[in-house]
């Protein structure tokens, strides 16, 4: 755990000006997608997301977090997502068109990366040894929000990668004492339902076994089970923090 937090501190101390620039670029591009969703803006967002995932792979994991175990594997994970966005730039699968989903939840996910440092400060942490907006889980939350707000067609590879990363984030809640990462895990439950509900609705006319109504019911059940699991994890973390506070 000491290595984990030391690498975060070194990363934040060395890259905080770049992180501010990245957050500003993300905000500008997101606003442009709402106000002026031209093809150039959409391509710029895909390039930005490819670069952002590459930043996490190279700068975060390989340069500043190389001391951690399996950092090369995690760098490969984010590198693959960067390649997927670059391929999407060529294939134009993700159109970044406004969806019929409520944008309130997407807006909440946009703001969650900014909440990461606030949660760290509330826990008594201080800069640079704290979570920041340009870290793996906060980037994943922002990407999920973007896809919920703008993507009609689901890029299933990105969805699977991001959901898998949410499970990794949940593990970090236990092993590294980062309750902030529960934000990503918790946001995945409604996001999963919204993603796959639309997929089921689009294929409602197809004859499948089970049928669309049964699939929707199974999806709701799955999300409830995952939500209960995440809730149990959060309660366990709160109990551990309470025991630590009492012992002090």
How would you describe each model-predicted region?
Residues 20-30, 77-91, 138-150, 183-199:
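Hydrophobic cores of alpha-helical transmembrane segments in multi-pass inner/ER membrane proteins
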Residues 211-234:
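Internal/C-terminal transmembrane anchor helices
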Residues 70-75, 175-189:
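Loop-to-transmembrane alpha-helix initiation sites
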Residues 40-50, 99-106, 151-162:
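Membrane-interfacial loop-to-transmembrane alpha-helix junctions, especially the N-terminal start
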Residues 51-59, 109-120, 162-174, 227-233:
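Aromatic-anchored segments of alpha-helical transmembrane domains
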Residues 1-25:
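Hydrophobic transmembrane alpha-helical segments in integral membrane proteins
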Residues 68-145:
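Membrane-proximal helix-loop-helix units in multi-pass membrane proteins
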Residues 244-248:
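Conserved small/polar residues in nucleotide/adenosyl-binding loops
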């Amino acid at each position: 755990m000491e290595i984990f937090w030391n690498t975060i501190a070194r990363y934040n101390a060395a890259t905080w000006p770049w992180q501010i620039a990245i957050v500003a670029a993300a905000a500008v591009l997101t606003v442009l997608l709402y106000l002026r969703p031209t093809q150039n803006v959409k391509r710029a967002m895909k390039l930005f997301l490819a670069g952002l995932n590459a930043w996490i792979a190279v700068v975060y994991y390989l340069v500043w977090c190389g001391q951690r175990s399996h950092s090369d594997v995690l760098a490969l994970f984010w590198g693959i997502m960067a390649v997927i966005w670059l391929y999407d730039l060529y294939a134009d699968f993700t159109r970044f068109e406004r969806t019929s989903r409520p944008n309130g939840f997407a807006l909440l996910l946009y703001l969650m990366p900014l909440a990461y440092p606030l949660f760290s400060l509330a826990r008594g942490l201080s800069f640079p040894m704290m979570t920041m907006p340009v870290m793996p889980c906060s980037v994943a939350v922002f990407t999920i929000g973007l896809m919920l707000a703008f993507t009609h067609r689901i890029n299933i590879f990105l969805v699977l990668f991001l959901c898998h990363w949410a499970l990794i984030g949940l593990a970090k809640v236990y092993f590294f004492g980062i309750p902030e990462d529960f934000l990503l895990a918790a946001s995945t439950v409604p996001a999963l339902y919204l993603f796959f509900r639309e997929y089921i609705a689009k294929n409602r006319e197809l004859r499948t076994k089970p049928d669309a109504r049964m699939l929707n019911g199974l999806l709701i059940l799955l999300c409830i089970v995952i939500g209960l699991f995440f809730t149990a994890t959060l309660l366990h973390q709160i109990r551990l923090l309470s025991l630590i506070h009492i012992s002090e």
